[in-house]
Amino acid sequence: MVLPLVSRWSARVLWASPGWRRTYTQRACVGLKRLGCPRGVYSPLAHRAYSVVAGGPEVTLTPERYPVQRLPFSTVSEEDLAAFECIIPGRVITDPEQLQTCNVDWLKTVRGCSKVLLRPQTSEEVSQILRHCYKRNLAVNPQGGNTGMVGGSVPVFDEVILSTALMNQVISFHDVSGILVCQAGCVLEELSRYVQERDFIMPLDLGAKGSCHIGGNVATNAGGLRFLRYGSLRGTVLGLEVVLADGTILNCLTSLRKDNTGYDLKQMFIGSEGTLGVITAVSIVCPPRPKAVNVAFLGCPGFAEVLQTFRTCRGMLGEILSAFEFMDTECMQLVGQHLQLTNPVQESPFYVLVETSGSSAGHDAEKLTNVLEQVLNSGLVTDGTMATDQRKVQMLWALRERITEALSRDGYVFKYDLSLPVERLYDLVIDLRTRLGPRAKHVVGYGHLGDGNLHLNVTAEAFSRELLGALEPYVYAWTAEQRGSVSAEHGLGFKKKDVLGYSKPPVAVTLMQQLKAMLDPEGILNPYKTLPAQA
């Protein structure tokens, strides 16, 4: 079916193949309820995450690059290893080669020196492990898919790595309510396939979906590409099972949409980055799968036109608008240079990706066509292409989703994940290009325009303290002046913990530290992360 677009668009229409249903990474899952990233599935992010040590120069140890001192935790002894082996026989990993990839973040910016990786399969095993670590004063680093951007998922020193990779079972799914209950180690992409087979979708979608775990998504309160339509995880997560620092299992794994009894304890752990407890299971509500998905990829002559295009789309598309992403021309050049992806439209200063999701293919296509005609005739858009076929939709989305991968191949990346007023979203990029000059290879901006989220990235040939000094605290102070947030969706982790004060008042920071001290008095859970050290 060819959509009835205006003549200037007709040559670029990508037409539908209604019978096509599988994404380009889909493979058969072993079993109905056991989920994980199966062998043979290509995930750019997973590939990068697990080749950083073998395929490139050794990453500098975190304490050698950052000013951080080891806290007085115990070190793992032979007796500790024997105790772990009793709890999870055959799943205590001490092989240095296997530990390498778990000690390094996928961006190759931080590296720990943990000597042991633990792979529990149940919440009870996690409880026994933490009970032992609590008594022995052993620091613990919870780890999911290790796709974090701020160094929160790898050890800083020699913390015990507690992996959720084998906790990958779907516990239940209700095909009327759409409520999914699963273990924390389920890979997001595999969960997406599981619920899609039942005519539902996950309420979040990330570029790292082929590797990231749902527990890590919740622990970092990940935003992603569906935030505009379905909101944050704070609204879609119904319940959690969490193991506290001393091994206590907190079972708040409710599947109720409404529960107004007492404090909503799960909210403490959403976005806590593993510092308050280890999430072991999640209850989440999944929206019905849209019957029709359309994507338009457009070129805009300036950022003012990007803003006006968003305003037009929001006004004319209403409830079917599910994503509105933007990127600058340097992003497009980098995905072409490093990933050989082809620009489907004429070269432009800015590009936007518009997605609609609804229940009527004809109705949605007509609405989107009217929008495209409007923005084209008004000069807001200079060129564009549209897709309704799932394969073509995935190809257009790849231009946006793989920007991070392209940047990682351009050199060392200084990454900033900021919330700003939409009208000021790109001003910081322009400002930094002038400020940094030739010291930076590229200064690029892209992100989720619909929720005011800028991903600001600066690449260089190698890590440079001079360049870091020019960026920080300048970026954070600039953001604070606009009453923005220094972390929109990536969290604070290790690298951003000391800038919390740019977004939160001292009273709020103190209260967070008191909460941490109450739930984890020995401070063994993900130390050196999320909160600034107390004086």
UniProtKB/Swiss-Prot annotation:
Q: What does this protein do, in the record's words?
A: Catalyzes the oxidation of D-2-hydroxyglutarate (D-2-HG) to alpha-ketoglutarate. Also catalyzes the oxidation of other D-2-hydroxyacids, such as D-malate (D-MAL) and D-lactate (D-LAC). Exhibits high activities towards D-2-HG and D-MAL but a very weak activity towards D-LAC.
The EC number(s) attached to this protein equal 1.1.99.39
Where does the signal sequence lie?
none
* Reactions that this protein is recorded to catalyse: (R)-2-hydroxyglutarate + A = 2-oxoglutarate + AH2; (R)-malate + A = oxaloacetate + AH2
Q: Where does Zn(2+) bind?
A: H448, H455, E489
Give me the residues that bind (R)-malate, please. R400, T404, K415, H490
One of the record's GO cellular component terms: mitochondrion
Keywords tagged on the record? FAD, Flavoprotein, Metal-binding, Mitochondrion, Oxidoreductase, Transit peptide, Zinc
Binding sites annotated in the UniProt record for (R)-2-hydroxyglutarate: R400, T404, K415, N457, H490
Indicate yes or no for the key word Ion transport: no
The set of disulfide-linked cysteines is: none
Per the entry, what modulates this protein's activity? Activated by zinc and cobalt ions.
Q: Which residues carry this modification: N6-succinyllysine?
A: K115
Q: Tell me the ranges covered by the FAD-binding PCMH-type domain, including all copies.
A: 110-289
**Where does this protein hold (R)-lactate?**
R400, H490
InterPro entries of this UniProt entry?
A: FAD-bd_oxidored_4_C (IPR004113), FAD-bd_PCMH (IPR016166), FAD-bd_PCMH-like_sf (IPR036318), FAD-bd_PCMH_sub1 (IPR016167), FAD-bd_PCMH_sub2 (IPR016169), FAD-linked_Oxase-like_C (IPR016164), FAD-oxidored/transferase_4 (IPR051264), Oxid_FAD_bind_N (IPR006094)
Q: Where is the transit peptide?
A: 1-50
The record's comment on protein family reads:
Belongs to the FAD-binding oxidoreductase/transferase type 4 family.
- GO MF annotations in UniProt: (R)-2-hydroxyglutarate dehydrogenase activity; FAD binding; zinc ion binding
> What name does this protein carry?
D-2-hydroxyglutarate dehydrogenase, mitochondrial
Chief location of this protein within or outside the cell: mitochondrion
